[in-house]
């Protein structure tokens, strides 16, 4: 596995541990359906939380959350729709971003709740 993939996986591990520590129940990690993918799907206070995880070694080229572009948001929304249909989930949905910055653990973690809303097409 490429070094950047290992680094990203380490960040996702830390993000999941952070969420569990905060009382979230992890439903799925790296959920795939065809080309659709969600980093973390969790439940918290009767909501389904879809979390996009971004890990960076530093912020020299911008903040990690800036990598969640409109195109990426559309993919996350489409993936969430597939997830809701597959598992017949009937909960309100919230979209969060967790950023992790640092060379290795402990990372600096930022949890951005309600980071974006589904666009109206």
Swiss-Prot record:
Molecular-function annotations in GO: nucleic acid binding
Annotated InterPro entries: Restrct_endonuc-II-like (IPR011335), tRNA_endonuc-like_dom_sf (IPR011856), UPF0102_YraN-like (IPR003509)
A Pfam family hit: UPF0102
Entry-linked Gene3D superfamilies: 3.40.1350.10
Family statement: Belongs to the UPF0102 family.
Name of the protein: UPF0102 protein BVU_1879
Organism: Phocaeicola vulgatus (strain ATCC 8482 / DSM 1447 / JCM 5826 / CCUG 4940 / NBRC 14291 / NCTC 11154)
């Amino acid at each position: 596995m490429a070094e950047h993939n290992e680094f990203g996986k380490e960040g996702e591990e830390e993000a999941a541990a952070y969420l569990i520590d905060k009382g979230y129940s992890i439903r799925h990690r790296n959920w795939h359906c065809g080309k659709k993918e969600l980093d973390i799907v969790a439940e918290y206070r009767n909501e389904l939380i879809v979390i996009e995880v971004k890990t960076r070694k530093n912020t020299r080229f911008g903040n990690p959350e800036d990598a969640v572009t409109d195109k990426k948001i559309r993919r996350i929304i489409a993936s969430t729709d597939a997830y809701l249909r597959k598992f017949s989930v009937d909960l309100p949905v919230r979209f969060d971003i967790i950023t992790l910055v640092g060379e290795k653990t402990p990372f600096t973690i930022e949890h951005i709740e309600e980071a974006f809303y589904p666009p109206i097409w």
